[in-house]
Amino acid sequence: MPFTLPESKIAIDIDFDPDHLRQRFEADKQARERKDQLAQFQGLDDVLEVDDSDPFSEPITREPVTEELDALVLGGGFGGLTAGAYLTQNGVENFRLVEYGGDFGGTWYWNRYPGVQCDIESHIYMPLLEETGYVPSQRYADGSEIFEHAQRIGRHYGLYDRTYFQTRATHARWDEQIQRWEVTTDRGDRFVTRVLLRSNGALTKPQLPKVPGIGDFEGKIFHTSRWDYGYTGGSAAGDLAHLRDKRVAVVGTGATGVQVVPYLAQDAKELVVVQRTPSVVQPRNNRKTDPEWVASLTPGWQYERHDNFNGIISGHEVEGNLVDDGWTHLFPELTGQHLVDVPVGELPEGDQALVAELADMNLLMSAHARVDSIVTDPATADGLKPWFGYMCKRPCFNDEYLEAFNRPNVTLAASPAGIDGITSSGIVVAGTHYEVDCIIFATGFETGSGPAGIYGYDVIGREGHSMQEYFSEGARTFHGFFTHGFPNFVELGMSQTAYYVNFVYMLDRKARHAARLVRHLLDSGIGTFEPTAEAEADWVAEVRRSNEPREAYWGACTPGYYNGQGEVSKAVFRDVYNSSEIDFWNMIEAWWNSGRFEGLVFEPARDAVPVA
């Protein structure tokens, strides 16, 4: 249908009615809104009926330790691993890592469900490839290969000898007298460290919906991050032979559900897919890594690939498209430039916003068309179509998910209200009772309750100030790293740092920055570093300003973790700096090169004080 931009009067050819879509989006949002918002979920460890123990490693027995350190890293996922790697590269030797899991890997240690893969090309997702001499075997690596790479990094940099596994931090307190952090653990350990680096990860604490009757179910229940292969048989590659006589319900159709459904559909006697909100699912087009391409690689190839990918999704001019994936095609399309014959940036501001909205809708219609082209049952196809802005939820890329709904043993149980309840023999969705032997929750992780709530410990800074309280209205940092009143503390997560889609690239860059600062502290006789209150406030204001356009978008979205389940003030991305990653890291590099460390205050090291 022809559509005319109101200010510039430029005609656009689209095949959908924007007003109809807006109305449908609002109806979908209202159907899924809940008064309890984030409170609708509970931690896996709060549900006694569902096992939260580690199914992958035998318990480690050891005595408590007391150590004095230059640096302590909390977390052994890719954030902690890259921190350890760059500390080592910078000649820092007296450091340790503390990790809750039984090995390195973080989310890749815990998530070993069938079909688990990354949704970012593995050649730019997996860090330190050149440094460790490894090239992934396929475009989108399986979780097992990513986990093995985490182990490879640990071995390469000697981090196994520096790490305490199956250990949780329980408390961190700044001691002003000795200019050190004191950190205790659930093992009775006591670490006294000059610098504390936190990299506990965004996907740390599994969550379940608060469903009545969960304790009444007499069958098997588990979360995808605690996959029970003893019950299902098989491995992450599939062949779940023990399910061939089982009726299974999988709850959740986000990134995990989309990956695991094809494997359950292949092996379960019956599969019920419980869906509250459908996902956008576009082609993945995975393939093996070309040996000739590997042979052609020259030093610096991974960083060149990073820069090219980030340049495209940030809207920079780059030479070619090295990654050529769903993300690098998606972000240029979101600008809407392909819809008009003039540069979008030259349009009146109102028309620019409208073109972006139409581009978003156009992408969603392409996702609908893909559903219709694959799913043969019209009612099921309609149930699998999302009705919300394309970027309201992280889009998925998979080549087997939609096809699974053509199998006779697969049923879609869709309801905007989610699960009504669980009985002794099954699950109730939209008033229909489904008899099942096993319920698998693919319901993700806590993302919106704040760092202290997720990580299970508080950080106490100067004058007894609690970081949990200090962050009660959102993160407060300088450049996403440092917080006023919490000297020598470095946050390695995504809070208030530029980040689009490649989480591990962000972790890698933050770890490099942090390790340089630790080295500088050790070399310069510095006792403490800490941002000024003014520098922190200015950065928080800049982050808030950058997110104003996104907050308006998320406010119109169906509930999900991007928008805090409708509570936008607690949205996971509210505290991410909405800026080009290239521009952000160029700014950080310029900050270093100036030599002024603007925004930080350094205090000299005091005379050594014995640690009691």
Curated annotation (Swiss-Prot):
Q: Locate the residues binding NADP(+).
A: Q117, C118, D119, T253, G254, A255, T256, G257, V258, Q259, R276, T277, K393, R394
Q: Top enzyme class of this protein?
A: oxidoreductase
Question: Any idea which UniProt keywords this protein has?
Answer: FAD, Flavoprotein, Monooxygenase, NADP, Oxidoreductase
> How does its activity depend on thermal conditions?
Optimum temperature is 35 degrees Celsius. At this temperature, its half-life is about 20 hours. Retains about 50% and 20% of its initial activity after 20 h and 48 h of incubation at 35 degrees Celsius, respectively.
Q: Which residues bind FAD?
A: E99, T107, W108, Y109, W110, D119, Y125, A169
Q: Report the Gene3D superfamilies cross-referenced here.
A: FAD/NAD(P)-binding domain (3.50.50.60)
Instruction: Please give the name of this protein.
Output: Baeyer-Villiger monooxygenase 4
Gene source species: Dietzia sp. (strain D5)
